[in-house]
Curated annotation (Swiss-Prot):
Keywords: Cytoplasm, Cytoskeleton, GTP-binding, Magnesium, Metal-binding, Microtubule, Nucleotide-binding
Function as written in the Swiss-Prot or TrEMBL entry: Tubulin is the major constituent of microtubules, a cylinder consisting of laterally associated linear protofilaments composed of alpha- and beta-tubulin heterodimers. Microtubules grow by the addition of GTP-tubulin dimers to the microtubule end, where a stabilizing cap forms. Below the cap, tubulin dimers are in GDP-bound state, owing to GTPase activity of alpha-tubulin.
Name of the molecule in the record: Tubulin beta-2 chain
Cofactor(s), names only, from the UniProt record: Mg(2+)
SMART domains in the record: Tubulin (SM00864), Tubulin_C (SM00865)
Localization, UniProt: Cytoplasm, Cytoskeleton
Chief location bin: cytoplasm
SUPFAM superfamilies: Tubulin C-terminal domain-like, Tubulin nucleotide-binding domain-like
Species for this entry: Geotrichum candidum
Amino acid sequence: MREIVSIQCGQAGMNQVSTAFWSTITDEHGLDADGHLRPDASSLESDRLDVFFNEASNKKYVPRAVAVDLEPATLDAIRSGPLGHIYRPDNLISGESGAGNNWAKGFYTEGAELMDSVMDIIRREAEQSESLQGFQLAHSLGGGTGSGLGTLLLTKIREEYPDRMLSTYSVLPSPKVSDTVTEPYNAVLSFHQLIDNADATYCLDNEALYDICEKTLKINRPSHQDLNSLIALVMSGVTTGLRYPGQLNGDLRKLAVNLVPFPRLHFFTTGFAPLFAKNSRAFHNLTVPELTQQLFNPANVMAACNPYHGRYLTISTIFRGQVAMKEVEDAIHTARTKYSPYFVEWIPNNVQTSVCNVPPKGLTTSATFIANSTAVQELFERTANQFSVMFKRKGFLHWYTGEGMEPVEFSEAQSDLEDLILEYQQYQNAGVDEDEELMDHEEYADEGVEDFN
């Protein structure tokens, strides 16, 4: 089997997002809360269980997951939660003091002290795999543990497993939903590591997730559970081709090869359809063209950037349910033609489609959208600007230098992110003649969502 080891780091990555992900895929693969196959589980559901689960004694399936946090409360919440019995107990590793929203504590001091024990567990999971394809990390870039310890783990895994794929689901901080003043520092220092050590980074942020919950799902006061359920939908959709047999479905490497034209440009935005309010039945059975229309709607992007402010380098779509490949290809071709000014001209065949006949629970059809768009630079620019304001006046810098960091590390991380922004701008403008076509389609960028309703 082509196994994937999942690493859950920090409160956002571990207790919340990953719990929602495991809840989703245990249900999709016919497992109960204790990891046993339900009597009604189909062979299709159980056929590729080994990718994300390891069969233990008594026919119990245990997630290939390592959960790490620098304070014990998060792990205690996992143990006492609805999936507490499914994890391997010694794969839950915690410190005692927390990271205090400080990247340096996660990367250099508190996190570094846990590194040997965490890597021992990761090695054991890798050794128990017949043909390990790679790792996926779920973490937040705003706090101290997910950002600092999470990216430290990436560097260690990259050193030890240089030929394995590393994917991350990274929750970016956003000014409208801010937990701590040091988030811009933590995020920029994390990007510096993600640029060098990740093969694919799925960018998500709470601002976009809140907007989807409020405007599309009609939830008045979205909870963290609501946001995490959205991320779990995306993680489930992205990993569909890894977990089920299907048409044109590949592995982590094939997905990255199709989406990443240049190694540093591996930051993706995602979307999911259908999204609808709980009391609405209108979208439960969308056609393939309707699903495709939702995928290209900027209101469905789970990161706070507008794809029509940039250009698509590459796209991958994953449709689920009893849909014909020809119908999917026709719908995508129509959308590709309609929005052609928003695709770069110099990458041929830059839209990949795949179909899995197993729909998500509770739906007859669904679709997941992965885009490598130059518009992702909006996320980077926002964070870089906030970083610059703080760094110029050396705000809170002593919290980091007190953990052994040097100011030059901040400057290097800042320069690396600014270089990345310039690279996205360069490839956005390559081959564009005075942006004439874009000017003719300006209404998509200006009006945004209205064109899709």
